């Protein structure tokens, strides 16, 4: 079962709205608070966004990167989670946050980035969270 945004999109935008207990604006914390998803070790790898037909993934669905063991990564190759808005052949439109950014904002994550690009910045590495 995919996790979906529980708030209107306009209400998630802004500085510091989704902080963890240490005051950090991590991507996974945004997903947990905005969708009621469990903690990352429980996340399951669903449909690959880049292989989905337009309309197969509903706007507001939680997506994330997963490693070769089908888990949310803990290695140095990058990890990220976001809210899916839409996608084209070029990339995924998302709402996301991370510590350095400090707020939820829309962003385009392109597909098929060069080898060595962090998973966080390659749309080809994102899957629906189940």
Where are these regions (language model features)?
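Aromatic- and glycine-rich peptidoglycan recognition patches
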Residues: 3-17, 85-130
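Short beta-strand-centered aromatic/proline hotspots
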Residues: 74-87
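Secreted/periplasmic proteins that engage bacterial cell-wall peptidoglycan
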Residues: 1-77
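Generic hydrophobic secondary-structure signal
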Residues: 30, 63, 81-84, 94
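Secondary-structure boundary/capping motif
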Residues: 59, 80, 103-107
